[in-house]
Amino acid sequence: MSGEQTEQISKDKAVAAEQARKEQIAEGKKAAESPEVERRKKNIAEIAKLNEKAREAKKQATEQEETTTSLLERFNLLKEWHLNQQVNNKVKNPAMESETEPALADELKPDMSNLFARPTVTDLQKMKWNAESNKMATADDMAFIEAEFQSLGVPKENLAKVMWTLTRYCVGASSSQYLDPKGEEEKLCGGVTRAALIACIKKRSTLRKVCRLYAPIVWNYMLVNNVPPEDWQSKGYTEETKFAAFDTFDFVMNPAAIQPLEGLIRSPTKAEIIANETHKRIALDRNANNERFANLGSEITGGKFGCRVGTKWRESKCDNG
């Protein structure tokens, strides 16, 4: 073997050894770096999973929010529909006969110039009628009384309350023409006495007629405040009928009287009506002993009161047969 060949072989071996050394170094580095790389890759994978879960959670939250919004909108629409159904006025039993008029034949139509004309039901429905009673004060009477009250110094803004309190006073004290009123309503009447107010009333009407006009109002007042007439027990009324123990009870349901805005709290019971009529009969009989005298001169009366009207209440018996 020549020297050149030997030299070439030595170079090749040196190159191979150098290559082997480099590969060994590379493998050593690779072996040293492998755990760190794996850890990084693992972390990257976990981060990717977390990001994916976050995106999924966000997507679900968005879908849930959209669903909630949709349900809320539907709920609001449903609530609005129900609110629209809540109306105060509902027509019931709609038999609206007054909407149409019968097509009467000409020969049946009433001749309004003839006093003997026969009205139809429609004609009667068209007639406007205001309830009136000659047993209570009229609007003309009340206009005069109101003017008198104001001229005495009763504040204008208190006129209605003054009349309410005055008629309520008469519930306990009486509405008789012989009533001797005491006291005054200082806060309402501006210092005007009850006696002066009642005197003004008597110029034009009677106290009882005025009290009848306000009977429904004092009735409601007593019921809503649970304050019956003060003398109910002394008049012989029972616990069940005590609210009927006043003079003008029989005008509580009179449509010509001034009505409370909401109407009567309740109507009088049969027991209350019977009790009031009974007491009225007793009171009239007690005061009727002198009614048969045509003249009250002593020559006629002999200086004595008349005989008491005899009413045999205790002999009234029920027929049990």
Curated annotation (Swiss-Prot):
GO CC annotations, alphabetized: helical viral capsid; ribonucleoprotein complex
Region feature (Disordered): 1-43
InterPro entries in the cross-refs: Carlavirus_coat_N, Pltvir_coat
Compositionally biased tracts (Basic and acidic residues): 9-39
Coarse class of the protein's main subcellular location: virion
Pfam families according to UniProt: Flexi_CP, Flexi_CP_N
UniProt cross-references to PROSITE patterns, sorted A to Z: POTEX_CARLAVIRUS_COAT (PS00418)
GO molecular function, one term: structural molecule activity
Subcellular location as annotated: Virion
Keywords, in A-Z order: Capsid protein, Helical capsid protein, Ribonucleoprotein, Virion
Role, per record: Required for genome encapsidation. Forms ribonucleoprotein complexes along with TGB1 helicase and viral RNA.
Family: Belongs to the potexviruses coat protein family.
Protein's UniProt name: Capsid protein
UniProt organism field: Poplar mosaic virus (isolate ATCC Pv275)
